[in-house]
Amino acid sequence: MTELVGRTRARCVETLSLDSTGTRNALSAALVAELSAALAECGKDPDVRAVVLTHTGTTFCAGADLRDPPDPDALVALLRQLIELPRPVVARVTGHVRAGGLGLLAACDLAAASATASFAFTEVRIGVAPAVISLPLLPRTDPRALARYYLTGERFDPAEAVRLGLLTVTADDVDEALAPVLDGLRRSAPQALAETKRLLTARVLETFDRDAASLTALSARLFSTDQAREGMTAFLERRDAAWVV
């Protein structure tokens, strides 16, 4: 079986690379399961100080795989796992991020992107809503500023992603920008990192506890509607949906 998540390690930093370029690293049931297993191993390994989540190809993550979507509960569990992992997780993005991929980005503790990256909440254009991914997104961003992109599905650039709170930093050379961040994590005590992360994620986890069930139900309901079926069919057929005027 082809591995969908690559793994390398350098000086106690484990790099997990989404590696399903044929689907633009879309969140399939298999990819979600493999990433979850890799994260679980990182969380148990005392030699892992931090995790970098990155990708191969030109897309960090295209969102849910419409041909092999993950169970909504599995996606919620993956996002929560990123947040609860007792190691800082740093997103490294050098390509496009769409829909559910932005949920992964928001679940990471820090996020850096190259100047060529682009972002879009495309759910509304296929007849659904960014429901489950709102669990990590809304507590960590400015909802008023986010409203434009949630409601329109427009693309936006890394500078705007920084302004919204989706990114920590953007730079022409993302690895150069991340070098001092990773150096700082390597210099920090593991126990202190874990407890400091707990402080930073407490409000996000409160949102999961309160809203996960209702947002999962909303996602399931919307994906079963006629508009969602039309939207997904139009997307796969590369045409405008019937409601476009």
Regions found by a protein language model. Give the residues of each.
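Hydrophobic, secondary-structure "cap" segments at the distal end of domains
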Residues: 134-144
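C-terminal long alpha-helix characteristic of the crotonase
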Residues: 112-117, 167-213, 226, 242-245
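Conserved CoA-thioester-binding segment of acyl-CoA-metabolizing enzymes
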Residues: 1-56, 179
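Well-ordered beta-strand positions
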Residues: 95, 109-110, 148, 152-154, ...
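Glycine-rich beta-to-alpha active-site loop
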Residues: 82-126, 158
